[in-house]
């Protein structure tokens, strides 16, 4: 079974949020979108200990825009569905027969946690729901809710620095085990040994021998085999290979992640990293032993915190093969470059709710996906985190706008503005991608026939947007001709080594300058010339474009 959607209203930092999940869901966004509140909501409602969390006054949302007014109610709704038709007949799900709701030939479960403040007391109700929101009344609702928590607990992995190696930690608040005492002691012994090895890896990696690594790998296998089933299953892959080039570039046809650990070609450092990750998973489930029938949902929180990008890629190749539903939060462009586009969800907080932007199957055709995969996901993954894309035709403009912004006192990267050269990838796929991900955009086109075609294409895609907001057309053939006519003629003559008295056509002067110097060098020379000139030579149109994109970026904070 698969967690399909969560609806949150009035919980901690989230006013309203509706978020769908895939087999792999990657969440990105700026710091204020409510990541901690979302992950806490999942962790508390699907706790491995199968205990109900008692809501506190601090769990109710405070709307600072409305004068620090605290919400009087909060609600969390989880929606589940089968991975395939007939899965509800499986032994682990048979008991939920009174609560199944059929939609689109699949069985669904709806769970609601509803809390409200009444007479300075918090009253909480938990129910299964019909599709229309009406409560399914059953005398053993709490029992079945706990059973679902046992079947699909949240296992939340954070930075290893948040994990404390405290052998004296109290576990009295949990039902620590339902296993026989001998088996429980063996599990504890294995975990203590694994903890000791991983702690030494963190402090003295050079002192861990190859034999100890091999022994620890076998230990991991014996422990994790209790929680995972590395066998064929009926879950469909997130995307076919045609939609996601290089999807399995690291796994070498390994279906079992442990096979990666024992391959001779893996470096010792890589094995240590992967062992540490898996140990973090085992520890993250807490002091409760998961049942053999459990199918955990893994939350991987900002895994780039302590991993070098190369190690991050190796770790991800290991994690992506784990046969479980995974939720990943990250600020790493390197990690975004190896996940499917359709797994990425960009969250943006607004005064009324947290908006989710994503790419669903079919919204981009195969050709569009190929282009944006190559030009954005693989070569410019940091662009996914931008607030605004400034789309330009050539390399000169990329250098020029970034450097000119510095002269006007702005840092485009700090403002969340990414300058993208679109000529090779095509314009339409980039605009479609920006709109799907909620990224603002503005195009600067040349005044030549090709530039006018780009401008016409933008006009056809405006919808309700104004042309002034989305499009700037240079009143010249290209950026070089535009600058030449705006007072930069002496510079171009100097770069082309042509005297002022030589009445050569503009076109030939610019051609000679470009032939003698690379475009980045010319762009930097233009910036230096602007900076050193006594009068303010920066063209008004360039100032206007910079001001426009900065206003757009600041308007969506």
Language-model-derived ranges and their functions:
Residues 453-524:
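Activity-critical C-terminal alpha-helical subdomain
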């Amino acid at each position: 079974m698969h967690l399909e959607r969560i609806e949150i209203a009035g919980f901690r930092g989230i006013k309203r949020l509706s978020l769908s999940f895939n087999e792999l869901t990657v969440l990105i966004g700026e710091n204020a979108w409510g990541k901690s509140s979302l992950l806490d909501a999942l962790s508390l409602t699907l706790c491995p200990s199968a205990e109900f969390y008692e809501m506190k006054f601090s769990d109710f949302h405070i709307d600072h825009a409305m004068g620090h007014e605290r919400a009087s109610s909060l609600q969390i709704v989880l929606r589940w569905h089968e991975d395939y038709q007939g899965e509800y007949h499986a032994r682990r799900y048979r008991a939920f027969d009174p609560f199944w709701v059929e939609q689109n030939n699949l069985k669904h479960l709806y769970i609601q946690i509803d809390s409200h403040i009444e007479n300075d007391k918090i009253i909480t109700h938990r129910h299964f729901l019909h599709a229309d929101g009406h409560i399914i009344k059953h005398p053993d609702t709490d029992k079945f809710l706990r059973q679902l928590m046992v079947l699909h607990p949240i296992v939340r992995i954070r930075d290893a620095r948040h994990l404390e190696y405290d052998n004296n930690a109290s576990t009295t608040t949990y039902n620590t085990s339902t296993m026989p005492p001998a088996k429980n002691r063996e599990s504890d012994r294995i975990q203590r040994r694994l903890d000791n090895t991983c702690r030494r890896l963190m402090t003295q990696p050079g002192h861990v021998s190859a034999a100890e690594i091999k022994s620890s790998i076998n230990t991991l296998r014996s422990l994790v085999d209790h929680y995972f089933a590395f066998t064929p299953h009926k879950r469909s892959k997130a995307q076919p290979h045609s939609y996601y080039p290089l999807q399995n570039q690291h796994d070498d046809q390994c279906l079992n992640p442990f096979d990666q650990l024992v391959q001779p070609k893996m470096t010792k450092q890589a094995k240590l990293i992967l062992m540490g990750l898996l140990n973090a998973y085992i520890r993250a489930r807490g002091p409760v032993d998961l049942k053999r029938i459990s199918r955990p949902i893994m939350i991987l929180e900002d895994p780039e915190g302590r991993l070098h990008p190369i190690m991050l890629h190796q770790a991800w190749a290991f994690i992506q093969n784990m046969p479980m539903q995974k939720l990943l939060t990250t600020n790493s462009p390197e990690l975004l470059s190896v996940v499917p586009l359709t797994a990425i969800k960009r969250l943006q907080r607004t005064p009324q709710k947290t908006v989710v932007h994503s790419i669903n199957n079919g919204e981009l055709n195969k050709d569009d996906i190929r282009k944006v995969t190559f030009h954005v996901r693989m070569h410019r993954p940091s662009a996914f985190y931008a607030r605004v894309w400034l789309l330009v035709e050539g390399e000169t403009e990329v250098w020029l706008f970034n450097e000119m912004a510095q002269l006007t006192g702005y840092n485009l990267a700090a403002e969340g503005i990414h300058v993208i050269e679109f000529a090779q990838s095509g314009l339409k796929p980039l605009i479609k991608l920006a709109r799907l991900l909620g990224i603002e955009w503005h195009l600067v086109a040349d005044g030549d026939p090709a530039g006018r075609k780009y401008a016409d294409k933008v006009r056809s895609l405006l919808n309700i947007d104004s042309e002034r907001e989305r499009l700037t057309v240079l009143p010249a053939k290209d950026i070089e001709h535009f600058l030449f006519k705006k007072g930069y003629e002496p510079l171009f003559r100097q770069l082309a080594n042509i005297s002022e008295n030589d009445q050569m056509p503009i076109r030939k002067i610019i051609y000679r300058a470009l032939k003698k110097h690379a475009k980045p060098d010319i762009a930097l020379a233009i910036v230096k010339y602007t900076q050193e000139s006594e009068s303010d030579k920066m063209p008004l149109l360039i100032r206007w474009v910079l001001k426009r994109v900065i206003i757009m970026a600041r308007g969506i904070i």
